[in-house]
Each structure stands twice: as structure tokens, then as C-alpha cells.
């Protein structure tokens, strides 16, 4: 869809429903999109998804991980909402804040003792900054151009996070 039908140079905005399923029990369902404001001065990018898959866990630390007898099955469920609002600084260059919320739930543990009292459920709230260079001719199926992005993500304890961390992607 287009936010300004009179601007033929503005790439169309988009929204997509996506999913995946596998024979081992993995499934994923999500919605993602890019809303380009008139004259491409601002961009709203979003991605919401949830998935579940069977996984393996050996316990915390090297010694537990090196012990093949510790291999245990569990089911992991995760949901994430990620939103960023970008401001155009120069042609093809954007910067803006982002927010992320994660919900993770472990279920059906074969060996719950390996978790050493860790909660089966956790949430995480993050704030951050995104830097973007995007010269693609078409956002969803580019023929020309470049897409370079750096996300700085901070998940401090004062946002209610039990496991505070930061990351760069």
C-alpha cells in the first residue's frame, strides 16, 4: 500500500503474514511490515511473532554441557514484539528508537533438575537505537541497492528484567 499515491518515487509500504512449520514439531506465525510516511521522512517498522519448537538442554556451565548424559528434551515457546520508528537524517540514512518485548516459556522438561531452580517463564523488555542505511529500490524484493542496519539493544533491570543484558546486532 502507498501512503502518498501522488509520490511515484516513494516505495510502497507493506505488511506480511508469515509462517513456518516442520515435521519435528516447530511452528511459527508472525506479522511484519514497514510503514513509510509521505516523502519517506519517517519509517515505522514492526515484527510480531510467536513460535514453538522441541529443544535440548544440558544444564548450565561447561561441565554440564560436556556431559552427554545430561541431554534432555523440553518444549520452548517464544513470542516477540519489536517496533522501531526511524527518522531520515540524510538520503537513505535513518536513525530512531526501538522497543522490544519478549516472552519465553519452557514446558515439558525431561530433567527439570538441570534447570537448577531457574524459572520456566521469563519476560524481557528492551529499549534501543537503530541505525539504518537503505538504498534498495523495492523493500521486499530489491534488485538494486544496499541494506545495512545496526541495532543497539539495552535490557536493564530497571525495566523489570530479571536477566539484564545488552546486545548489538
Predicted regions, residues:
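Gram-negative/organellar outer-membrane beta-barrel architecture
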Residues: 1-123
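Surface-exposed extracellular loop regions of Gram-negative outer-membrane beta-barrel proteins
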Residues: 2-14, 53-56, 130-159, 164-169
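Extended hydrophobic/aromatic-rich secondary-structure runs
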Residues: 26, 99-159
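Hydrophobic core residues within well-ordered beta-strands of beta-rich domains
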Residues: 79, 93, 125-127, 146, ...
Amino acid at each position: 500500500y502507498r501512503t502518498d499515491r501522488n509520490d511515484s518515487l516513494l516505495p510502497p509500504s507493506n505488511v506480511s503474514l508469515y509462517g513456518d512449520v516442520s515435521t519435528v514439531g516447530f511452528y511459527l506465525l508472525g506479522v511484519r511490515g514497514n510503514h513509510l510516511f509521505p516523502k519517506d521522512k519517517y519509517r515505522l517498522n514492526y515484527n510480531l511473532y510467536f513460535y514453538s519448537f522441541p529443544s535440548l538442554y544440558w544444564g548450565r556451565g561447561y561441565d554440564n554441557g560436556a556431559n552427554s548424559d545430561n541431554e534432555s528434551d523440553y518444549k520452548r515457546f517464544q513470542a516477540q514484539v519489536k517496533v522501531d520508528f526511524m527518522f531520515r537524517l540524510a538520503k537513505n540514512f535513518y536513525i530512531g528508537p526501538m522497543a522490544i518485548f519478549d516472552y519465553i516459556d519452557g514446558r515439558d522438561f525431561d530433567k527439570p533438575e538441570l534447570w537448577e531452580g531457574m524459572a520456566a517463564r521469563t519476560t524481557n523488555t528492551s529499549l534501543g537505537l537503530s541505525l539504518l542505511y537503505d538504498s534498495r529500490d523495492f523493500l521486499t524484493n530489491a534488485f538494486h541497492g544496499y541494506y545495512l542496519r545496526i541495532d543497539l539493544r539495552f535490557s536493564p533491570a530497571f525495566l523489570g528484567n530479571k536477566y539484564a543484558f545488552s546486545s548489538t546486532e
